[in-house]
């Protein structure tokens, strides 16, 4: 081949002509150098690609070919053999990808010429895919060393040693587009999983310094924003299913409709997924950076009470003008033991909601390491204040008022126990009095509460010791009202401990001496012996109180049984069901009386009719007799005779 034919850029041909080109190839013996000499003699330095391709013989290096390549060559040389499809031609190209057209991809200026495999000479036919050839060292045809790049496969000597060899030194990389056209892999490219992309990002890929700098800045800013936006919440242990509610938050996975190959989007999505699966953090009572809510929203009127937890203030809310009771802790709670009790009270208030015999809860917040709880204001104070005032003036609650107290607090305990909670600190200072003239509505259970005095309403408050019945975390309350089984850490009958404390609360309201905190009298009470009551109570009430402090908690009535006890449901305090039963009985009696009345009326009517008939008969008989007498008289009488006397 002439030097001019190598330097002149060959004309562009379509790759689709390779199939027809392959069928017209004519092989002639001779070396490459002889062919070039003939071309020089003819003066055909501008020969076309077809002439050079038709007249060039095979490369004289067929000895080191593999059996698969030899079989492919034999099929091409057999007479009448034609490739079945263009895909078969590309398969042959892949088998001999170490040389020929496969090697034409790696060169410099002459790398655009496509060598027809099996001939060893360069063809000026331009391949459209040569612009996309890759120079990657990885190839389906692997060679043993850097010198094994010959078209005959691995282990063959390099053809470039021959000065007349037309093969340049190209790496063994197949055409990129041609390899894709083989469709060896039918499935589409599978996107990387989230974990694999995260590993790729963590391993550190090669990136531009400027782009990575801005990317890190953006991602760090995004993470700081997400951290600020992620709320920290407490988990209420008194909700029906706190574990399920918490786990459902973990399952809020954000589904994407497509996968983005961008590393920024991928890392951002991974971080969002981690934020959603992050467990909720517990908020501690710390100083707030905002303005004091207590002084901003409320106007303090007076201090109405104090206790172990803190002080209670009577306040007016500036917005609505209503009066509330604000409970503020005495000392800072952050990190102290009382913090758990404060949070437990907030949890219990939030779960219990609104009930006529439970102090209503509105809100709670932390301010300057103090807990503040906004509750309903009870204008009658606590029962302990009323007992102290009665003890000072030597006045006690009457038996009717004691029954009223038992029934109302019992209904409050029934509601708390129905929520699978126990109060564990029932005592006079935790029962509040609300005096109102508004008639009470029908309770949730359907019981009519109109019989209750419309002047006094007893409510249960201070829920700092509330715990669950199923998984108790008991914090012992006042020892004066503590049941013995709780002291012995027997938590199998916790609702009955509230009944025990309620009985002693009623005893204190009845005028008994202050209860002992320990000692022999304390044990006597736990053995079922009532303290001395200065007033005389009925036998039924005394027996009910004695049963409520029975040493065996199973013998004590439950809150449900207590509110339906016959002692508390007197003639004026009967339930709607009992009133309905009595009404039905009275209706039955009335129906019987009506039947008797009808019978009496019928009998009287019959008697009157008989009497009238008898009277008529007597009148008819007397008339007949009178007529007969006149006729007789007429017969007996002589005819009148007129006399004329002169």
Swiss-Prot record:
Keyword tags: ATP-binding, Cell cycle, Cell division, Kinase, Magnesium, Metal-binding, Mitosis, Nucleotide-binding, Nucleus, Phosphoprotein, Transferase, Tyrosine-protein kinase, Ubl conjugation
Catalytic residues, chain numbering: 425 (proton acceptor)
Cofactor note: Binds 2 magnesium ions per subunit.
PTM text: Phosphorylated during M and G1 phases. Also autophosphorylated. Phosphorylation at Ser-642 by BRSK1 and BRSK2 in post-mitotic neurons, leads to down-regulate WEE1 activity in polarized neurons. Phosphorylated at Ser-52 and Ser-123 by PLK1 and CDK1, respectively, generating an signal for degradation that can be recognized by the SCF(BTRC) complex, leading to its ubiquitination and degradation at the onset of G2/M phase. Dephosphorylated at Thr-239 by CTDP1. Dephosphorylated at Ser-52 and Ser-123 by the serine/threonine-protein phosphatase 2A preventing its ubiquitin-mediated degradation.
Molecular function as annotated in GO: ATP binding; magnesium ion binding; non-membrane spanning protein tyrosine kinase activity; protein kinase activity; protein tyrosine kinase activity
Family label: Belongs to the protein kinase superfamily. Ser/Thr protein kinase family. WEE1 subfamily.
Reported function: Acts as a negative regulator of entry into mitosis (G2 to M transition) by protecting the nucleus from cytoplasmically activated cyclin B1-complexed CDK1 before the onset of mitosis by mediating phosphorylation of CDK1 on 'Tyr-15'. Specifically phosphorylates and inactivates cyclin B1-complexed CDK1 reaching a maximum during G2 phase and a minimum as cells enter M phase. Phosphorylation of cyclin B1-CDK1 occurs exclusively on 'Tyr-15' and phosphorylation of monomeric CDK1 does not occur. Its activity increases during S and G2 phases and decreases at M phase when it is hyperphosphorylated.
PANTHER family listed in its UniProt record: EUKARYOTIC TRANSLATION INITIATION FACTOR 2-ALPHA KINASE EIF2-ALPHA KINASE -RELATED (PTHR11042), WEE1-LIKE PROTEIN KINASE (PTHR11042:SF72)
Quaternary structure annotation from Swiss-Prot or TrEMBL: Binds to 14-3-3 protein zeta.
Protein name (database record): Wee1-like protein kinase
Organism: Mus musculus (Mouse)
